[in-house]
Amino acid sequence: MKNLLKMSDLSPAELTHILDVADQLKAQQKLGGTAPLLAGKTVALMFSKASTRTRTSFEVGVYQLGGLGNYMNTAELQAGRGEPLKDTARVLGRYYDCVVWRTYRQSDLEEFAELAGVPVINGLTDYAHPCQVLADLMTIRERRGNLAGRKLCFVGDGSSMANSLIVGGLLAGMQVTCVCPQSYRPAADVLMFAHKYGSAFHLTADPAEGIQDADVVATAVWNTAQPGTPESEQRLRDFVGYQLTGKLLESAKPDVMVLHCLPAHRGEEISSAVFEQHAPEIFDEAENRLHVQKAVLAILLAGK
């Protein structure tokens, strides 16, 4: 693994290795701390949009591994005043051992990675959220054991979370269903990847059909527009029936796990009652962002 830009960068063996290392690092941290695997290493934490979990978990993770993490808002860099991306990449690659970047366009991230000359990690783009999906898979494995054969259902907007969860779930040997309105389908290349897995992947616009007998149901914010705007009102109409409610989840397995990458808009993609009922696994999922990201850093920078 040279970078982590999207889930399809990983082989099934690499995915399993990341989860295994994350388990080890989590156990060590609970016992008092991990070895300084990143001693002398520097990590740029570059953010072009707001973040709570990604920023703080990377800051804490780099510190726990003995490295130095520097947060930077791209609006405060010369890149925010028009300096070409390729110049920023070539400069930061000479200062830092690794760059984490949360930005908008996946194409910008991939161009940056080609030029930086150091490992680059996707902290979220409009196309992919690999760190979050690694945390999801770690959480499922912790609570349910083997991932292979389990039914994973995503309900919501077929954007970054859906794209990454589909690929990650299939790489892990899961049966994956994506439930979304027709006009909010996942990326075309993700669907091409998924259809290679045949009956292990299913795409539907019917939430009740998709959730049937699911072991795990995941969702994410789908009303990403500014409240009160025409786009927001349109999304509220388009996603009627896609809220995770107790009634909808009746068709899933009785012990279904519910995951949410956060932040959650209660009353939109998930009801308050369902969120609170499944808060233990949702906040385990949030904690595991720290551990999987430490694993990725340890593999990329310390040969773990």
Question: Where in the sequence are the language-model features?
Answer:
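Glycine-rich phosphate/diphosphate-binding loop of Rossmann-like nucleotide-binding domains
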Residues: 48-60, 142-220
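Short, structured coil segments at secondary-structure junctions
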Residues: 65, 95, 115-117, 172, ...
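Anion-binding alpha/beta catalytic cores of soluble intermediary-metabolism enzymes, centered on
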Residues: 90, 97-168, 260
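Rossmann-like adenosine-cofactor binding region
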Residues: 195-273
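Adenosine-phosphate binding glycine-rich loop
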Residues: 255-256, 261-304
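Active-site cofactor/substrate anionic-group-binding motifs, chiefly glycine-
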Residues: 42-43, 47-95
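Positively charged, low-complexity intrinsically disordered leader regions
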Residues: 1-56, 60
